[in-house]
């Protein structure tokens, strides 16, 4: 491993060098997928949704909800699956009955950090200035809630919208940590973070987000003019996510996603493994990859993500995970004019000039293009 100059802050392993961000077909091995409800079917269709609803109800499906996704050009429709049919059967039946729709399961996407995991080395490792950097792009955060009035967020503003069902107070621990890494003291300044609360504080252990919440949050952010989105959640491949997030990417939104913490031999996690996302892995102070990080040819870039010091609820705590690494990349992209672009392919190419190579020479499946570095002048 190359020595890192102090100036500078998840997939199956295949030998050899692979261009950062290159994609292979989905592997035969897939991650074990969690679903919110085995009797729930999610469908995306171009508006109006009348034909879809009529055909589905004729087949015995019960309409649960309709959510317009105007900014993405779709309608999100939720059905209850009839007794005796599996999700796979329901997907195939619905897509056959109404050509052009995309049907899928209500998969869950979990937070990718561990608490607790010694010093605040991260900003020095990537060369981030002590006074922080001015944000040049509007930033979004898809995560748990951000605690209002948190003292560590006095340098940044947060506009928050809730996309989870029910009225239980949102979980704010992880979302606040991510917001601090983006707009806390010495981070991005002169900006507002658009925080989408998608992690359900009640269902499925309280650390998971459903597909519908994520898609509705992306639609909201498009309407707010958000250009750069941080997603520290990971889960299975989902056709609905592919369609909606892919459309947002085509419209110029850059998605920065945690690679996942299932380990180096685990299958790719999504949305990081989608070709339109920037997949972020985590490294420690020595530049060694986080031992639980997912690896693969979809990994784009590395950032500090092991034993990261963060203030939380009036005390300091240490956190590790690809979830923690992603905001460092998001912050650099927001502040560095040389990385400003409307398509992820251009950003991916430019990262080769804004990273420090790690591991074997050139881009690889462990570190991607290498360790992200802060803009020289911000």
Tell what function each PLM region has:
Residues 102-104, 194, 254-257, 279-280, ...:
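Structural detector of well-ordered beta-strand residues that form the stable sheet scaffold
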Residues 17-23, 27-33, 222, 226-233, ...:
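C-terminal subdomain of the subtilisin-like protease fold in secreted/lumenal serine endopeptidases
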Residues 128-139, 144-159, 166-211, 274-275, ...:
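Subtilisin-like serine protease catalytic core
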Residues 5-15:
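Bacterial N-terminal signal peptides
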Residues 70-73, 89-156, 366:
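Protease zymogen maturation seam
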Residues 143, 269-342, 349, 374-376:
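Extracellular S/T/G-rich loop segment that most often corresponds to the catalytic His/Ser-adjacent loop
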Residues 129-135, 207-229, 239-255, 265-279, ...:
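Mature extracellular/periplasmic domains of secretome proteins
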Residues 22-112, 226-228:
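Inhibitory N-terminal propeptides of secreted protease zymogens
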